Amino acid sequence: MKCLCFVVLLAILIAQNSSDLGVKSASSDGFVSRKGVQFILNGKPFYANGFNAYWLAYEATDSTTRFKITYVFQNATIHDLTIVRTWGFRDGGYRALQIAPGVYDEKTFQGLDFAIAEAKRLGIKMIITFVNNYSDFGGRKQYVDWAKNTGQNVSSDDDFYTNPLVKQYYKNHVKTMVNRVNTFTKVEYKDEPTIMGWELMNEPQCRADPSGKTLTAWMNEMALYVKSVDSKHLLSTGLEGFYGDSSPQRKTSLNPVAANVLGTDFIANHKLDAIDFASIHSYPDLWFPNLDEKSRLNLLRKWLECHLEDAQNILKKPLILGEFGKPTNTPGYTQAQRDAVFNATFDTIYESAEKGGPAAGALFWHVISDGMNNFKDPLSIVLSENSTTVNIITEESRKLGLIRGKGKLSKTKI
């Protein structure tokens, strides 16, 4: 307990120093760009291991809890994790970023500023998502409700994709985000190389049009708009990766049946010119709960391999596995099962990366700090616990580091 208190105190002091003295980048890293199926950083192929931490801006809104961001980022660097994916939204509700259309809470925005500044200081790249598909933290539903309150004829969350006013709300949010001047670094978000890229939405879906045409049209319009206001950053969709009508065989063999009505199309959505890299997620335990563990592992490998094959041959773009994990509340769960999921995932990513393929990295869901019980769920991981899973994560980071010319490959398992 004394040791933990010391670590927390140290993190607080570091956070205060970052705020008081200004923030300097931990390295001279520039913007991540794309060349064919590879990401490029400072003239070299960029591969990275990473994690999700959706809560960064929320916790950093309160200056007394900002040490949690510092502590998690410091632990991430110990394990050679170099990308974090987080939310660039909180629409309405407690600690909202966007209180009403175009109206922002400065304190919450400064929380996101701090998270970006700390990532910059510690050499971590960020992928930031503009809005949520789900009603958690506002999402599409909140945008539609805002429009409805003005008298717009909207009745479904899927009106988000077609109503002109709602679409303008989204564009306004994008414009506000990219033009934000970070209060710590004094750099506009659109000029900040710490931000690796943006995502249009977290897990976009449109049940009103299972053909996928509505969602593809919306993505095309919004992707072009994002590029018109920020030409420096990469952009992806935030998709789970379910196949659509453009890939009928993949749709039949890989999608869970429930996904066929979600209106997404992995190929069509990512073939858009303004989309720079492919996004997929992987949760076989949630998608196929009735299968046994071995069958789910086989499906996991096939899911990744098929998407990587399509990224290479059809999309000709890099791919990031934006979310994956093993829920601890899965019936019969064991630590060995979670380790097997992480090993299978990382092995597939590494095999592609080693050959110069499109796999750029995997971001597990999700990291929390000690004592963050309000964010704990069946998928959360505390890096400081040094579990066997964390050891597997570290090994993958070091292997990818060897490919990009950093670090050394361990001769033995950690």
Swiss-Prot record:
Annotated catalysed reactions: Random hydrolysis of (1->4)-beta-D-mannosidic linkages in mannans, galactomannans and glucomannans
Range of residues in the leader sequence: 1-19
Gene3D superfamilies according to UniProt = Glycosidases
E.C. numbers: 3.2.1.78
Give the matching InterPro entries: Glyco_hydro_5, Glycoside_hydrolase_SF, MAN-like
A Pfam family of the record is: Cellulase
Localization, per the record, is: Secreted
Q: For this UniProt entry, what is the primary localization, expressed as one broad class? A: secreted
Name the UniProt key words of this record, in alphabetical order. Answer: Glycoprotein, Glycosidase, Hydrolase, Secreted, Signal
Q: Does Glycoprotein appear among the keywords?
A: yes
| PANTHER family named in the record | MANNAN ENDO-1,4-BETA-MANNOSIDASE 3-RELATED, PTHR31451
Q: What name appears for this protein in its UniProt entry?
A: Mannan endo-1,4-beta-mannosidase 3
Q: Its encoding gene is what?
A: MAN3
